[in-house]
């Protein structure tokens, strides 16, 4: 049985939006030129992501100032998940903590 490729995104104690995007870039192994914004995240999910599962850790450690950013991230991930379904591809994400 083939195992799913899983990406683990650890946001524990992330303090700045730039740091959040750098952790995304590293977790997904996006290129250095990743634009560090939600449009760039969407673009690279569609073109560079071969993961079938994303586990997100550490959201509960973020300050309230990140609430809107996390909602935007979840929106982009949900769009990507739905886009994958159209092409019979699998992508799911789970917020662990």
What do these predicted regions represent?
Residues 2-97:
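Positively charged, polar, low-complexity stretches
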